């Protein structure tokens, strides 16, 4: 089963001090490579946890404080990625593939990336594939992945007189995009342009 346990097994088995200098740095082999600050959200999302849920009245409430499941995932991340040194600790954000090309150089077994970056992998010497994040346990109902859409909101002017019409138009455009644009994106970009 593709679970956190199996993921841990793989990423902790491969980290090696390649240059023999006694410390893990950019010259060594790692199990996992990622953007700074993304580990924890990616893993708690993969475990099916939500930071915001609805209360009994249908209002959104913050779900993290006092939630033992989030603490369990945090402890797992801390142990596996940091204490077992399965993760290359770097300071770059979304440009980490340019600043620290560990994955492209074959120095990382796994790397998280948005599909935007998959095109940068075409020139890699090693073959690569695209997989989902693991389930927390085999009993989890399905796989979950954090989707980063690039825009959190759309601004509508305060002076707008037709808010309902604008909302309906935005919803229709989103629906059409999901139905028409995304399948073409998968076919043209992911299967042809970005992959090999």
How does the language model describe each region?
Residues 8-10, 95-111:
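Short helices/loops that flank or line small-molecule/ion binding pockets
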Residues 18-28:
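Acidic, glycine-anchored loop motifs typical of Ca2+
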Residues 36, 113-118:
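Beta->alpha turn/N-cap motifs
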Residues 122-192:
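Extracytoplasmic/periplasmic substrate-recognition and gating elements
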Residues 8-13, 42-92:
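Glycine-centered hinge/linker elements that transmit conformational signals in sensory
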Residues 8-15, 74-78, 100, 166-174:
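Non-transmembrane alpha-helical segments in soluble domains
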Residues 1, 33-58, 148-157:
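Periplasmic solute-binding protein
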Residues 2-5, 64-71, 97, 159-164:
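Soluble non-cytosolic domains of exported or imported proteins
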């Amino acid at each position: 089963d593709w679970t956190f346990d199996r993921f841990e097994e793989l990423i902790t088995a491969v980290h090696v001090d390649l240059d023999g200098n006694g410390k893990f740095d950019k010259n060594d082999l790692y199990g996992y490579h990622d953007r700074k600050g993304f580990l924890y959200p990616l893993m708690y999302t993969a475990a099916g946890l939500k930071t915001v849920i609805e209360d009994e009245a249908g209002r959104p409430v913050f779900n993290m404080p006092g939630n033992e499941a989030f603490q369990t995932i945090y402890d797992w991340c801390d142990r596996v990625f940091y204490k077992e040194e399965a993760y290359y600790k770097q300071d770059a954000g979304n440009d980490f593939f340019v600043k620290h090309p560990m994955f492209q150089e074959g120095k990382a077994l796994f790397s998280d990336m948005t599909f935007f970056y998959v095109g940068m992998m075409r020139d890699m010497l090693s073959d690569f594939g695209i997989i989902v994040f693991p389930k927390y346990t085999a009993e989890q109902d399905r796989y979950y992945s954090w989707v980063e859409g690039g825009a959190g909101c759309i601004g509508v002017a305060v002076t707008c007189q037709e808010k309902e019409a604008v909302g309906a138009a935005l919803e229709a455009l989103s629906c059409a995009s999901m139905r028409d644009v995304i399948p073409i994106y998968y076919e043209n970009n992911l299967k042809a342009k970005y992959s090999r």
